[in-house]
């Protein structure tokens, strides 16, 4: 078929002379962009021909055969009421078996109608395969715009769109597409119409039910109530999600560590811990984040001040919730209590972290060595041990640290600040841990107890060093002779033998001794008295055949002759 326009005293020109048509095989080789370009060009061509046709009136147009034409008195709304979809163009429903006479009329001349039919119920014109002359004929016959002809009289507005897409006559797009890929391509061509506007905020929706759901936000209505606690919700899905907190239902399971979640979004977010994915990247500094909330807060540091200030200490925050959480520090309130041991916390997140101690859960696993951690912060710090990353650098000396608090503590060396002062003797310290250890001198407290012999120590390092006596471990080995020691200090003294370093001289002799114990023993020869009076220094009493001498802070185990 070819629609032609006749101009006075001009030769007849058919639409085929200016149109470009494709076979089914050729059309299938075009991507979505190429198809869209084809439609755009054909619409422009049709528009020009229709404009030319206005001067000559429709009578000059070769009419569509009368047995295929749509009766004039039947409107589009009446077609829809009868269950006829708009993409049948001229009244022929597309979900019937085989092409209709109208479809055969639209097919390219000389082609087999059966060969042009794709995947059963899908017609050519619906997929966009209708020839340009067929579309143009529709424009001329029905006096509509190119867009209306292509998309099935969209000018009738959102009502028709709603009827078709909502399926008032049980008609759905999916029924026409046996292959999902064709549906996706089709939806990319169709304009996304959102005819339902919210009168409160102007937000548009494609379906009326979505508008009704949204409008509840403005009215404050919460029709869905939890029967367990009485809490109300504005959506049924929110109620369903909330009810899982009562019944303990956690249907979403992590395939990596087996951890369960009551929300799919929480599982997705958790899986980023295993994958290391950080999809949220700051455009300003390039820093990446695992969670959107952290990314949003970080962005505010580039663009905004901290509008929420604490009235007690003046510290600023980007969000009011963070200020409220911070203010609990000043009030001393701890509303979140552990049901296992009764310990209370001022943050819900701290309580959750604490509960992992009771459950033994360690969800954060190092991908390098397989070590697992209870807290995410500890996991991040451990990863830096593998990568060697030290992001916190001292501006004074350039020394870098992997932990921020180590940098703050180090900076006190440059400032000379010692903020931690002992109330008993007035001695000041740069670290809280130093003050705590010092106070044990006054209290006599020794919190670190050996589980083997019960001996107590005020420092963990002393306990660890002592425990090697029980285990027999000797990690410090001399590289010269292979002799091993359980402490570093005996190894250091031993190495002087190899280096011929003679650091100690006897009191009355020119002979030089290698070690402090040798010096003590040598002094006995001259004084013929106990080692204590010989060296004139405070040492523990010497037991028979064995003693433990504390010299210069080192605990030295030696067997001394008496």
From Swiss-Prot:
GO terms for cellular component: nucleus. InterPro entries: KRAB, KRAB_dom_sf, Zinc_finger, Znf_C2H2_sf, Znf_C2H2_type. Keywords: DNA-binding, Isopeptide bond, Metal-binding, Nucleus, Repeat, Transcription, Transcription regulation, Ubl conjugation, Zinc, Zinc-finger. Pfam families: KRAB, zf-C2H2. One of its GO terms (biological process) is regulation of DNA-templated transcription. A zinc finger (C2H2-type) spans 196-218, 224-246, 252-274, 280-302, 308-330, 336-358, 364-386, 392-414, 420-442, 448-470, 476-498. Ubiquitously expressed at low levels. Highest levels are found in pancreas and liver. There is a cross-link at residues 117, 194, 203, 207, 209, 250, 278, 287, 300, 305-306, 362, 371, 446, 455 (Glycyl lysine isopeptide (Lys-Gly) (interchain with G-Cter in SUMO2)). One of its GO terms (molecular function) is DNA-binding transcription factor activity, RNA polymerase II-specific. SUPFAM superfamilies: beta-beta-alpha zinc fingers, KRAB domain (Kruppel-associated box). It is found in: Nucleus. Residues 13-99 form the KRAB domain. Belongs to the krueppel C2H2-type zinc-finger protein family. May be involved in transcriptional regulation. This is Zinc finger protein 460. The lineage of its organism: Eukaryota, Metazoa, Chordata, Craniata, Vertebrata.
